[in-house]
């Protein structure tokens, strides 16, 4: 029952998580919708069993009864007897989003859960759009937090913001090379830098590979951030630190993930599409791309000659303190 439907539920797919929804509740909702779809499928024909039933003797006018072998359907597998065929599914969740954040969230069903581990090991970058609001600071870096101070921002310009973003990107790119454990003078490091495939080989602090301002209309501004090993709270703190470098203050009003590895907004299923058929189609559509990208990253990893690492490479400081290290260059 539903074996064909279950066979197509093996792989990775992406959904769009709205703000205000916990990832755990999202996973439970998707699981319930999948179970509902699987159990609603037409069940196979029941098995036939031979039973001896009383019946009239054929060709006889006398009212005599005899036992006759008769094929009858077996009800042991009927859903009203056994209950629903599927009662739970194991669904894995990729790089998670906190309650306030929204955007692309990768989920896995069946053998796709092992592919999530491959995604983690590939250290793929993720894209975010982050909205900020100048002029105030709160205790949790969010607009709804407890107000700590209000500041003026008339002196803030787009050019000054762009300079600070350039400092952040430059410092994090240096840290990225360091955590990749590459020989900075080698041809390999140069070629990987040109291809844009330099990635850390182990755990590291949040690393930003790209950051730019998409929109600037004080007090509001919109940033695009490409990063890895981040949390959404770290991105909110980044907005706060940018405000300090601008000699004012800032809070984060939105964190939205637009890409997670090889899944983008176009791949993410909206809430109205969280059903069996849409998810099956999404898994089938993504499967060739997932296999190709993971194979590509595996080849890069095998071809990467990793140098010995002892703690933080070459005495590098935490790149989260980038602003303090090089703030003077943005002034």
UniProtKB/Swiss-Prot annotation:
<feature type="compositionally biased region" description="Polar residues">
    <location>
        <begin position="319"/>
        <end position="331"/>
    </location>
</feature>
<keyword id="KW-0496">Mitochondrion</keyword>
<dbReference type="Pfam" id="PF01509">
    <property type="entry name" value="TruB_N"/>
</dbReference>
<feature type="region of interest" description="Disordered">
    <location>
        <begin position="309"/>
        <end position="331"/>
    </location>
</feature>
<keyword id="KW-0413">Isomerase</keyword>
<dbReference type="InterPro" id="IPR039048">
    <property type="entry name" value="Trub2"/>
</dbReference>
<dbReference type="GO" id="GO:0006397">
    <property type="term" value="P:mRNA processing"/>
</dbReference>
<keyword id="KW-0809">Transit peptide</keyword>
<comment type="similarity">
    <text>Belongs to the pseudouridine synthase TruB family.</text>
</comment>
<dbReference type="InterPro" id="IPR002501">
    <property type="entry name" value="PsdUridine_synth_N"/>
</dbReference>
<protein>
    <recommendedName>
        <fullName>Pseudouridylate synthase TRUB2, mitochondrial</fullName>
        <ecNumber>5.4.99.-</ecNumber>
        <ecNumber>5.4.99.25</ecNumber>
    </recommendedName>
</protein>
<keyword id="KW-0819">tRNA processing</keyword>
<dbReference type="GO" id="GO:0005759">
    <property type="term" value="C:mitochondrial matrix"/>
</dbReference>
<comment type="function">
    <text>Minor enzyme contributing to the isomerization of uridine to pseudouridine (pseudouridylation) of specific mitochondrial mRNAs (mt-mRNAs) such as COXI and COXIII mt-mRNAs. As a component of a functional protein-RNA module, consisting of RCC1L, NGRN, RPUSD3, RPUSD4, TRUB2, FASTKD2 and 16S mitochondrial ribosomal RNA (16S mt-rRNA), controls 16S mt-rRNA abundance and is required for intra-mitochondrial translation. Also catalyzes pseudouridylation of some tRNAs, including synthesis of pseudouridine(55) from uracil-55, in the psi GC loop of a subset of tRNAs.</text>
</comment>
<comment type="subunit">
    <text>Forms a regulatory protein-RNA complex, consisting of RCC1L, NGRN, RPUSD3, RPUSD4, TRUB2, FASTKD2 and 16S mt-rRNA.</text>
</comment>
<dbReference type="GO" id="GO:0035770">
    <property type="term" value="C:ribonucleoprotein granule"/>
</dbReference>
<dbReference type="GO" id="GO:0070131">
    <property type="term" value="P:positive regulation of mitochondrial translation"/>
</dbReference>
<dbReference type="GO" id="GO:0008033">
    <property type="term" value="P:tRNA processing"/>
</dbReference>
<dbReference type="GO" id="GO:1990481">
    <property type="term" value="P:mRNA pseudouridine synthesis"/>
</dbReference>
<dbReference type="GO" id="GO:0160148">
    <property type="term" value="F:tRNA pseudouridine(55) synthase activity"/>
</dbReference>
<dbReference type="GO" id="GO:0009982">
    <property type="term" value="F:pseudouridine synthase activity"/>
</dbReference>
<dbReference type="InterPro" id="IPR020103">
    <property type="entry name" value="PsdUridine_synth_cat_dom_sf"/>
</dbReference>
<feature type="active site" description="Nucleophile">
    <location>
        <position position="98"/>
    </location>
</feature>
<keyword id="KW-0507">mRNA processing</keyword>
<dbReference type="GO" id="GO:0003723">
    <property type="term" value="F:RNA binding"/>
</dbReference>
């Amino acid at each position: 029952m539903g074996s064909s439907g279950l066979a197509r539920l093996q792989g990775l797919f992406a959904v769009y998580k709205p703000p205000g929804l916990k990832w755990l509740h999202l996973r439970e909702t998707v699981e319930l919708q999948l179970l509902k779809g699987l159990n609603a499928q037409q069940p196979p024909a029941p098995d036939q069993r031979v039973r001896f039933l009383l019946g009239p003797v054929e060709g006889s006018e006398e009212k005599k009864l005899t036992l006759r072998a008769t094929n009858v359907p077996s009800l042991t597998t009927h859903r009203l007897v056994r209950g629903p065929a599927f009662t739970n599914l194991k669904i894995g969740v990729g790089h998670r989003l906190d309650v306030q954040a929204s955007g692309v969230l990768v989920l896995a069903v069946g053998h796709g859960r092992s592919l999530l581990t491959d995604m983690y090991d590939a250290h793929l970058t993720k894209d975010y759009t982050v909205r900020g609001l100048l002029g105030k600071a709160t205790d949790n870096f969010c607009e709804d937090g407890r107000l700590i101070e209000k500041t003026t921002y008339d002196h803030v310009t787009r050019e000054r913001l762009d300079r600070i973003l350039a400092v952040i990107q430059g410092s994090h790119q240096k840290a990225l090379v360091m955590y990749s454990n590459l020989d900075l003078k080698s041809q390999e490091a140069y070629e990987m830098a040109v291809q844009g495939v330099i990635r850390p080989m182990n755990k590291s602090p949040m690393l930003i590979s790209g950051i730019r301002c998409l929109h600037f209309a004080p007090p509001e501004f919109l940033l695009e951030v490409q990063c890895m090993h981040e949390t959404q709270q770290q991105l909110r703190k980044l907005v706060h630190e940018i405000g300090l470098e601008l000699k004012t203050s800032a809070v984060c009003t939105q964190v939205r993930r637009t890409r997670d590895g090889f899944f983008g907004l176009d791949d993410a299923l909206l809430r109205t599409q969280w059903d069996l058929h849409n998810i099956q189609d999404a898994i089938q559509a993504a499967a060739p791309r997932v296999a190709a990208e993971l194979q590509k990253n595996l080849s890069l990893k095998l071809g990467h000659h990793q140098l010995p690492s002892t703690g933080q490479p070459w005495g590098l400081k935490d790149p989260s303190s980038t602003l303090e290290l090089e703030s003077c260059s943005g002034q």
